[in-house]
Amino acid sequence: MFIELRREVETALSEALDACGYPTDDLGIEEPPEDVDAVFASSVAFRLASAAEAPPPAVAGELAAELDAAGREYVGRIEQQGPYLNFFPSEAYFEEALEAGQSERFGELDSKDTSVVVEHTSANPTGPVHVGRARNPIIGDAVANLLSYAGYDVDRHYYVNDAGRQMAVFTWAYETFDESDLPEPARDRAEYRMVRYYRKGNEYLENADPDAVEAAEAEIQDILQGLEDGDEATYERVGEVVDTVLDGMKACLARLPAEFDEFVKETQFMRDGSTDDVVDRLQALDGAVYEDDAWQLAFADIDKNLVFLRADGTSLYTTRDIAHHEWKFDTYDRAVTVLGEDHKLQASQLRETLSLLGNDVDQLDNVIYSYVNLPEGKMSTRRGTGVQLDDLLDEAIDRAREEVETRLGDRLRDDDLDEADVERIAEQVGIGAVRYDIVAKQPSKAITFEWDRALDFEAQSAPYVQYVHARCCGILDEADGLDPEATIAPLDTDAERDLLRTVARLPGVIESAADDHQPHKIATYTRRLADRFNTFYRECPVTTADDAEVRRARLALVAAARHAMANALDILGVEAPESM
């Protein structure tokens, strides 16, 4: 109903502006302050004041005289407040919003018949997932969830870099060194076992005798050239290493969880000839030059050239990624890529090159994020230093378990929890805290992860909003068979109406957040919903209300709040516990 109400507001404003002879291109629709009961407000009078040669309140008054809620289904009344115009919902809006909230699928938008591929994570398969890069799968998974809720047909891809020097070094090291020469792995999982070879190989290349290094580099170059030439045996050798490491990385990412529909390998675009085709077309462009022993593409508005072919005839990552993106454009209507801030230049070069090759780059959107820091400073992936994502998740669960155990005496319900229940809740809360704390911030802003904030049950954190969902479930379980009734008349207090107004906003928040690829807007919504619900919970008894009609209506409101919170958390990839 929120989206339908907004359309009515847009229509009413456009008609009033047209009647007054004003342009209708910018309606100035916004969310009013929290102390205003309106759902929408318009600041359009500020924009028109200069042309009207009148102060904004006078312009607003002129428009208010033309605005009429009569005949509108969801706009109940319209009032001027100084330079602003406030739009208040009708009883029909509240009634239909409460009814819509009874569905477990509340918030899902109609199909847009548009396919979208969301590429995220795509960490090089060289070892465990590092916590500094954890923002990518968390944001990427949330963006994919968000677009799915918004009605898009979404595929989730992990682009596997299986063709660069790192993988050639890794393959050479795996085939060269004996496991007996390696230290014990940090964990008994594939990527932790395999990364020892990669580290050993890099250490050897840095410290070994120059002649030995030269021989090793020749072997590494042979692997690179074999990939470039389409040698099947080389693909199999590299593929064994890549697939083994990826199996372990998948297990780590599944803990978040972040799962994928397809792992698209870089070598696919070497083997099918599309990379060679890209090279030929790039060489034919006016900006293509051969200098510094490589083919490069110069841009009009980007200072740094794109190197797309080495002197030895081997392609580069970005060259293959161009072929990859053209494949995306042929397969999907839209493409979204989640990238770290250190890829900004590469992303700009890629977009410009795709455009020069005749592609419609309006199909492509990037979500750029800054990295995660711990309080002691920025973490590094070089030489295996820093904290792995597994370590962070383990500690999150341990800390959550301690917190849950200390709160067992304050639980809403008197049922007994066994150890398995405590462990389940600890995992839901702990991993949820990590995801929520990371996804709740604007991607472009750096994050310093702090446990006290992430696991604070009283502050606006994952446990805080998860607790609201658990509380809703507890109330509904205590209803003893009393059926909710989605009737608005008994819900006449400010706390009830404020909660319902907030519940009803979810579809609009999803639409706006999806348009901008900003899942943090959903996190903001969950905090507001939690605040409104807690006020309602304090002021409005549900199962103990004196009037049966009030009890049923409030139960319906609790059910709507539960569905709104559950689905908002689902978008964020945070579990919604039924008990805590």
UniProtKB/Swiss-Prot annotation:
Position of sequence motif 'HIGH' region: 123-133
Catalytic activity: tRNA(Arg) + L-arginine + ATP = L-arginyl-tRNA(Arg) + AMP + diphosphate
Domain of life, source organism: Archaea
A biological process from GO: arginyl-tRNA aminoacylation
Statement: the UniProt record of this protein carries the keyword Protein biosynthesis: yes
EC number(s) on file: 6.1.1.19
GO molecular function: arginine-tRNA ligase activity; ATP binding
UniProt keyword terms in alphabetical order: Aminoacyl-tRNA synthetase, ATP-binding, Cytoplasm, Ligase, Nucleotide-binding, Protein biosynthesis
SMART domains tied to this protein: Arg_tRNA_synt_N, DALR_1
Pfam families, sorted: Arg_tRNA_synt_N (PF03485), DALR_1 (PF05746), tRNA-synt_1d (PF00750)
UniProt xrefs under InterPro entries: Arg-tRNA-ligase, Arg-tRNA-synth_N, Arg-tRNA-synth_N_sf, ArgRS_core, DALR_anticod-bd, Rossmann-like_a/b/a_fold, tRNAsynth_Ia_anticodon-bd
Transmembrane domains' residue ranges: none
Subcellular location: Cytoplasm
Matching HAMAP family: Arg_tRNA_synth
Family: Belongs to the class-I aminoacyl-tRNA synthetase family.
Protein name: Arginine--tRNA ligase
Organism listed in the record: Natronomonas pharaonis (strain ATCC 35678 / DSM 2160 / CIP 103997 / JCM 8858 / NBRC 14720 / NCIMB 2260 / Gabara)
